[in-house]
Amino acid sequence: MKWLGLTVAGMIAGFVTSSAQAQDISAGERLFKRHCGICHIAEKDSARRLQGPNLWGLVGRKAGTVEGFRYSDANKNSGIVWSAETLDPYLTDPREVIKGTTMAFVGVKKPDERKAIIEYLAAQK
């Protein structure tokens, strides 16, 4: 009986964690659309084009490398590989992180919103 109780407790904990992660992704998607969606999409194999590049598979990718998109020399030569650690300061103030970027975005000032957007982007793979 004790094992059954532990099993059920473990299942509930797993469900709560999965549910919380799904909520974070959902919040991140909403924030992505609000802050980034005017210029970017994050869609697998999409031919749809907006002002900015498709951000599907962004985490782990080198900055300035989406084929067919014209990047500034600053972006192409930044040497940045996108991760939570590089995205957070970039989403705070892109022009401070990559001086000379052509991205016209003032940044996301709230840390919890940046975190949610980064978690959403990390899941788009």
Regions inferred by a protein language model and the residue ranges of each:
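Short, exposed beta-strand-loop hairpins at the edges of beta-sheets
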Residues: 106-111, 116-124
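Bacterial N-terminal signal peptides that target proteins for export
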Residues: 1-8
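Pocket-edge structural micro-motifs
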Residues: 59, 84, 107
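Cleavable N-terminal signal peptides
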Residues: 9-10, 20
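Periplasmic/extracellular electron-transfer cofactor-ligation site
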Residues: 23-70, 75-81, 89-101, 123-125
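Sec/Tat signal peptide C-region and signal peptidase I cleavage site
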Residues: 16-24
